[in-house]
Amino acid sequence: MGYEDEFPESLELFKRAERVMPGGVSSPVRRFDPYPFYVERAEGSRLYTVDGHVLIDYCLAFGPLILGHAHPEVVEAVVERVREGFHYGTPTLPELKLAEKVVELVPNVEKVRLVNTGTEATMSAIRLARAYTGREKIVKFEGCYHGAHDAVLVRAGSGASELGAPDSPGIPESVAENTLVCPFNDVEAFVETVERFDEEIGAVIVEPVLGNAGCVPPDEEFLKVLREYCDGTERLLIFDEVITGFRLELGGAQEYYGIDADLVCLGKILGGGLPIGAFGGPEEYMSRVAPEGKVYQAGTFNGNPVSATAGLVTLEVLERERPYDELSSKAERLASALEDGLEDRGIEGVVNRVESMFQVYFGIEEVRDYADVNSADHDAFKRFHRELLEHGVWIAASNYEAWFLSIAHTETDLERTEEAFEEALDRLTG
């Protein structure tokens, strides 16, 4: 049976969606050929589609659901909070508690501003860095996706890469000119760039792990060089930890790699599955944010008590259970099984992993930057993705996204996934 036969109800819903939504979806990365399936509900490690299929989920909404879907403690807290109202437009105890927890857990953060998305977090952090340094240019890295705002949608990753349009129409050249782009992990290119534009640079922004090009870890010296440059020139180093925050360690990539950023951007896990974002850092910088300072940032739904409640409970569970060794072990097992499967069949490819996030790249032996990701065999990945889906395993449809593990993934899930690897790889070589 073909995909259309397996997902007929999803097809009818997608036809309706195409009539009223651009491309039939609310975010480009959710679209894949011939059309996306629709999910009715989710629990633990499983998605339940409108067509009656049950899928083991390693996309996890692109990373937020480190506890799995509908974790009982999160659900109970959110339901209780919703009974008290959804949003008030006033300060609330949940936002205060979440802010206190972020300051407690995340290195080098003394104050934090809660926003609604990762995009808002990076946009605001860049504005703050420019205001603090008095310089307009920023340095970013190829494939690093920092949200959908003009300053950073230049040679970005995630859906921008998959669409082949990382430089979106509608971005003024005058804006793009203030964004300097270097290859990820290329220290020499970074040094050349900052030497050329040094007096104009206000900030360096980076995903510590390139998670919007799959999973590309930093070379040992790469992040250190960025930190040393910013230390020596009084520029601000911004870590975009929307993906890595609370994922690699409780204190995120700063704790994991032992390198402090000046400003850190958070999202995904911070909201426990509900919309949220945040940026924070030392009081020296954050005191510039309005109303304490003059750097303006505001939002009707900033600090939403329902999102803050979900996020707080999620962080409390992570703090209590400290599941990071377990999560890493699960991911290592699957990554190793996939590597063995490639080797046994003589399939060229590589699996990159950092703790509980990983990705496979076909047709290439090493992936350490965005150019390598672009050189991988994406047609092979799409076939592999489709085969896994037919065997009940869901991963993001794009090679530019990561796979994620959660505490909800069971031994049975891992065994079934390993079996699906075998079947899918056999089909690739058959």
Swiss-Prot record:
GO molecular function, one term: glutamate-1-semialdehyde 2,1-aminomutase activity
UniProt catalytic activity: (S)-4-amino-5-oxopentanoate = 5-aminolevulinate
Name of this protein: Glutamate-1-semialdehyde 2,1-aminomutase
GO CC terms of this entry: cytoplasm
Record pathway: Porphyrin-containing compound metabolism; protoporphyrin-IX biosynthesis; 5-aminolevulinate from L-glutamyl-tRNA(Glu): step 2/2
Keyword terms, alphabetized: Cytoplasm, Isomerase, Porphyrin biosynthesis, Pyridoxal phosphate
Subcellular location: Cytoplasm
Enzyme Commission code: 5.4.3.8
Family, per entry: Belongs to the class-III pyridoxal-phosphate-dependent aminotransferase family. HemL subfamily.
Gene Ontology biological-process entries: protoporphyrinogen IX biosynthetic process
Species of provenance: Methanopyrus kandleri (strain AV19 / DSM 6324 / JCM 9639 / NBRC 100938)
Annotated SUPFAM superfamilies: PLP-dependent transferases
N6-(pyridoxal phosphate)lysine: residues carrying this PTM: K268
Uppermost EC category: isomerase
